[in-house]
């Protein structure tokens, strides 16, 4: 199983944005749409061995945790950002009345929303997966021997805060796909391709 966790510092937590202007009105939910498509989509297929957590920390009701479970997902992911953003809108609407942090609502089969925090999701993932934090100064990904259950933590265009990084220290090994800062969607695509090339891929 491959899990990808991305923290979106400014992504809106209420569906108050325009689908025709995601970059300008949503706190960059367009970044999350591209991330999802890179995590799941193949040229002529869909990755069922992938789980994605979108952790939204923008206004007005942070946090919101949206989980896409590839093995159970019934709704179609298309390459365009608009249709993917509609799924996020549906999740935010379904999660609007949530009060309990641990309660998760199923929006569609394989699509869930909750009020879990970044720390909650990392701790939950740690129970079943080795966790890696994508960082420019990390150990080269080509040097890592990956187990069968892996999880990768990424920041959005703003990155993770010093507090987030301090929390990950001792929990997640820092790994790098290169010494430059790359787009999150490109990073997840590269990781999938790299893992696919291993003799016994996760």
Curated annotation (Swiss-Prot):
Please name one Pfam family that this protein belongs to. Answer: Methyltrn_RNA_2
Gene Ontology cellular component terms for the protein in this record? cytoplasm
Report quaternary structure and partners: Homodimer.
The chemistry this enzyme catalyses reads: pseudouridine(54) in tRNA + S-adenosyl-L-methionine = N(1)-methylpseudouridine(54) in tRNA + S-adenosyl-L-homocysteine + H(+)
Q: Which molecular-function annotations from GO does this UniProt entry contain?
A: S-adenosylmethionine-dependent methyltransferase activity; tRNA methyltransferase activity
Q: What does this protein do?
A: Specifically catalyzes the N1-methylation of pseudouridine at position 54 (Psi54) in tRNAs.
Recorded hits in SUPFAM superfamilies, A to Z, give: alpha/beta knot
Location(s), subcellular: Cytoplasm
Coiled coil: which residue ranges?
none
Annotated S-adenosyl-L-methionine binding sites: 134, 155
Q: What is this protein called?
A: tRNA (pseudouridine(54)-N(1))-methyltransferase
Cited InterPro entries = Alpha/beta_knot_MTases, TrmY, tRNA_m1G_MTases_N
- Tell me the organism: Thermococcus gammatolerans (strain DSM 15229 / JCM 11827 / EJ3)
Which EC number(s) are documented for this chain?
A: 2.1.1.257
């Amino acid at each position: 199983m491959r899990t990808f966790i991305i923290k979106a510092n400014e992504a809106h937590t209420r569906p108050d944005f325009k689908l025709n202007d995601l970059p300008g009105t949503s706190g960059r939910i367009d970044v999350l749409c591209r991330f999802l498509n890179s995590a799941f989509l193949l040229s002529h297929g869909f990755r069922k061995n992938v789980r994605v957590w979108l952790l939204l920390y923008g206004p007005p009701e942070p946090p919101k945790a949206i989980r896409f479970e590839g093995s159970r997902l019934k709704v179609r992911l298309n390459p365009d950002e608009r249709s993917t953003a509609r799924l996020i809108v549906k999740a935010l609407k379904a999660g609007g009345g949530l009060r309990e942090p641990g309660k998760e609502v199923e929006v569609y089969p394989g699509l869930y929303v909750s009020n879990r925090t970044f720390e909650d999701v990392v701790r939950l993932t740690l129970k079943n997966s080795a966790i890696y934090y994508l960082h420019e100064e990390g150990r080269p990904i080509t040097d890592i021997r990956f187990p069968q259950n892996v999880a990768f933590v990424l920041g959005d265009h703003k990155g993770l805060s010093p507090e987030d990084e301090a929390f990950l220290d001792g929990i997640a090994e820092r790994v790098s796909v290169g010494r430059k800062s790359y787009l999150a969607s490109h990073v997840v695509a590269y990781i999938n391709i790299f893992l696919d090339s291993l003799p016994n891929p996760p």
